[in-house]
């Protein structure tokens, strides 16, 4: 677990280099959400930006889950600034031992967190247990890039204290084959795994927020293409009760 100081450094990194990603992710994920109980879990919320986006866009109750109290402190500050605190619960939870009841959540999301899980199979089983019939789990994370991807990002992210987070995410990442095996070992039947790409609708729905995002105006958006090319999306669906 990273220290409180490292959590603040991570937030600074995200604010400078990745803040524009969250409106785009929020747009995509909110379109994938089918409300039933109106409960969303953001597994590994970090600074809370994805939870905030989902709360704004879906009006569901979002559980912002993190195992690190220092990250929760940051996320709570950001939610208060955004005016959505009443829609978000900040839960100190371990993905391997979730306290939620069976079939509790309609939608479980996780961005750039799975590579931190100590036991991916156990974490997937817990998420699937908590997922309601008819619900979805959507997990996005990196796989280890080939060739020049890391060096390109090193040139774009010049601060060593920030680049560290990118390098470690790549070093701890899993291959497509690994993810397929984890899901199968977890006994999860209905899933898809693909390389992630933003869609035109994601940009259209996020234009107002993107205009205010650092680096968006002055760069050529090459960073988001690099992020896309090394990001996978796992989508798990639990069949509705009584479905054939």
Curated annotation (Swiss-Prot):
Signal peptide limits: none
Disulfide bonds: none
A Pfam family per the record: Methyltransf_11
Taxonomic superkingdom: Bacteria
Entry GO MF terms: methyltransferase activity; S-adenosylmethionine-dependent methyltransferase activity
Protein family membership: Belongs to the methyltransferase superfamily.
Name of the protein in its database record: Uncharacterized protein YxbB
Gene field: yxbB
